[in-house]
Regions:
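Short, charged, amphipathic alpha-helices and their helix-cap/turn boundaries
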Residues: 27-32
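Glycine-rich active-site/cofactor-binding loop and its immediate structural neighborhood
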Residues: 190
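DPxDG-like acidic metal-binding loop motif
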Residues: 2-23
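C-terminal nucleotide
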Residues: 19-20, 33-46, 52-182, 194-234
Length: 234
């Protein structure tokens, strides 16, 4: 649910280009495009393009996936203070549940391709993007939580394996103990739950969700980067 496979692919490709002395080719857009080609075309994974672009670009961005297959990346710069404020209003928990992202996404892909009402749900999810970007830019954290909640309600209808009774119970507990909204990250079925929650309510929330572990995190601002390259190999 944290985009680990796509992050690995982007990082591996970045490293290969650096070792070949072709680091100048490792633009954010090119790394993302190559990673998409490897995962979607070469490996045939039934996934989207969001994770690859998020890993390559880093930071907060609005990605627009256009009909011609191109991707437009619009940075969402909150500044140092705004980013810190955003981080302080988000809490991340690991549910302990394991799931196959590919199997859930395969079902989701099949169902969205064969059922017209699924396209309506996807359109509604897309319609939440600009309001969420506006809420982030203007520090409207309660609205951010409400939009995350609305997105999660829509996402659950896309495939049967996205949620389960345990996840539903955890989510309901969170809403009853300070969270204004949230969502399960990734394909669904398990992994990490992200909640919007005022800092003053986070201790209460964590205590209520005592059966799962809270994970501290910070937002990555730079995307993929090579930390060390052997000069003898470029």
């Amino acid at each position: 649910g944290m985009g680990s496979s796509s992050s690995f692919t982007v990082g591996l490709l970045h490293n290969v280009l650096a070792q070949l002395g072709r680091a100048d080719e490792a633009t954010k857009a090119h790394l993302a495009e190559m990673a998409c080609r490897v995962e979607l075309e070469d490996l045939g994974e039934p996934i989207g393009k969001q994770d690859q672009y998020a890993a390559a670009y880093g930071g907060l961005n609005v990605f627009r996936f256009l009909p011609d297959g191109t991707v437009q990346a619009d940075p969402l710069d909150l500044g140092t203070e705004g980013r810190a404020e955003l981080e302080s209003h988000l809490v991340l928990y690991y549910t302990g549940d394991q799931r196959s992202a590919s199997s859930i996404l395969a079902e989701q892909s099949k169902r969205t391709a064969t059922e017209q009402d699924k396209q309506r749900v996807l359109d509604q999810m897309v319609d939440l993007v600009d309001p969420l970007a506006s809420a982030l830019r203007n520090g409207r954290w309660s609205e951010m939580g409400n939009l995350l909640h609305e997105n999660w309600q829509l996402k659950q209808s896309l495939a049967s394996g996205i949620t389960n009774p345990n996840l539903q119970s955890l989510y309901a507990t969170a809403l009853a103990n300070g969270a204004t909204g949230g969502k399960l990250l990734g394909a669904g079925g398990g992994g990490f739950l992200l909640f919007a929650c005022p800092p003053s309510q986070q201790s209460r929330l964590t205590q209520a969700l005592g059966s799962i572990r809270r994970f501290p995190f910070s937002l990555e601002t730079d995307g993929s980067k090579v930390l060390y390259a052997d000069s003898e190999n470029g």
